[in-house]
C-alpha cells in the first residue's frame, strides 16, 4: 500500500494479486487474465525481435543526450546473455528459487530500465521499488526499505554503496537483514573505490563468514545495456570482465587509453 501511495496513479486502474489495495480502482489479476480481448492478442502477435520496445535517452556523458532505439530483440537477448553466465542450479540452491531485489535506480536510465527491470522480469523475480536514494533527504527511506526486504541481489551506483558501507558498519540489524539471503552484489554507472569494497566485504565476513561477489561490467544505452561483466568472485575494483556470450569487443587505441 505504501508503494502505491507514493505514486501518482489517481484515476488509474490497479491490477493486484493478494490483498486488494485501498482507495484505488482495482481488479484482481486472475479476473484480468480471464477477460479476453482481441486487441491484446493482435498486438502481441505483431511483435517481432525487430519491433521497437522503447526510445531510451542517453545520459549525456559523451555529448548531448540522444534517443536510442532499443528493440525487443535487443533487450530480450541482453537479459538472456546476463542470465547465461550464472550457475542457475547453484543460484536456486542459494536463494530457494526466488530472486528478490529492492532498487531505486530510475527507469529513465538504461541501468534501471534494462539491467534491473528486464533481468528481474526474465528471472521471474520480485522487484521492490525503493523510494529512497543516497541523498541526505532520502537515505533514511532507503535504509528502512533494506531493513524490511532481505534481497538476494543488490545492484546500485557507487554513491549508494559508499553510504551503505557506513550504515552497515554501524547498524548490526541492517547488516543482518542485508546479508541474510544475499548471493551477489554489483555496481555500475561510475567507478568505485577499492576502500568501499573492502569495508563492505569486512561486514559481509563478520555477518556471514565469507566474502560475497561484488561485480561490475561495461555497457551503454546502445547495448541495452550490458556488454561485458565480471561474473566471478573478485577482489579488485575497476574491472569490466570479458564480453558476454554473443558479444565481440574490438580494442581501439585512444590516446593513453584503450
Show which residues each predicted segment covers.
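Conserved adenylate-forming
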Residues: 4-24, 95-97, 116, 123, ...
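Conserved pre-ATP/AMP-binding loop-to-beta segment of ANL
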Residues: 15, 33-57, 64, 89-100
